[in-house]
Amino acid sequence: MNIITWLAEPNWTGGVTETLDWKTDVLQSPTGAEQRIARRLSPRRTFEFSILLADNDRQRLENAVFHAGAARWAMPVFSDVYVLPEDIAAGGNIITLDTVGRDFSAGGKLLLKDGLAMNARSSLIDIENVTSDGLNLSAPLAERWPAGAILYPVRHAVLTDPPDFTRYNTSLSAAQIRFRVDEHNAFSDDIAALPRYRSHPILEPDSNWSESVTGQYLRLLLELDNGSGLVARTDTARRPFVMQAHTWMPFGRDEQAALRSLFYFLRGRQRAIWVSSPNHDFYPVSGMNGNVIDVENAGFADFGIVPGRRDLRIRRTDGSCIYRRITAATVLSEAVERLLLDGSAISLEIDDIESLSFITLCRQESDSVEWQHTTDGDGLASVSTTFRGIRDELESV
């Protein structure tokens, strides 16, 4: 059977959920040392959305699903929609548009539609190559397409499950649709814009506070319990591992493309990145003129300096950041303790310091990332993940 084009538009009241799934083998010792091996060249992608169809649209979709439910579909990437601002004449083989952040690929396909209905005029067109400002088509357009026509990148995909239709009456139905992209999913992993510290990138900006940020200090505990005596417990790593949730709400195609590049760099659980605590971990009581800063006594010096809690981000009020390692800490009084930092001297007035926060070398806790497209890529999305601390002294730092 030929590939069938999916023509039913999503119901955007619930958005479109895109899931990126990497596969990583994490070989962890009882001490927390890790070897991480990526098993996929690119992530598997799934798209999930709801539809609400009536009358002829419902009839057309149910006929298509009945006959081709197990086949490969030409699935429009709905979050990368583009509306033609002007007419395109028949015979042309170039479509001018901003392709950055849109899922076009050389040798791939695009879908042109002259409306939202399933019976609207549509055409599946081959792409020869992609530039930053347009698409070169494999053959000239056979028809004229007016301003307002809709253009989508297309991916070959399969339905992961048969749609379960909810029938509200004789002509109106809803269903939840889930596609899995059935081809390689390449994307740039360039994160050169991010700062670096000790050979690894640093995650910026901070988590979005539209919802509470969660965290914990995970221990690798081994318990022996014979059921009658006391339980014997061993902390095999003899240190905690930070677990830190992080949420982004990127707006616009540039922010979303940069965030996608970050996830492609991280490759699920494989690669490491420095992640800042969301807290003000110290309150300064002095400025800096050298490598020493005095802070309110937070009990840090009492426990000593240990891996995983010795690297500091100093954020200035202008938004710029300085990253340093704490090399010594001493208690000056009940109210003040002093931190000695490595690196070059720093000159800062106390009013120039916005926050002092720990940073921890982390990897993602999961290989799966959910990307909630609230609107198309020119608007708002929401993405959340959880980072897990690793033993930075054993990484290449």
Where are the language model's segments positioned?
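Autoprocessing Asn-cyclization modules and mimics
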Residues: 52-143, 188-190, 196-209, 253-343, ...
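Polar/acidic, low-complexity leader/linker segments enriched in S/T/G and N/D
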Residues: 1-21, 182-214
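Short solvent-exposed strand/turn elements
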Residues: 132-158, 164-185, 333-359, 384-393
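Conserved small-residue-rich
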Residues: 199-252
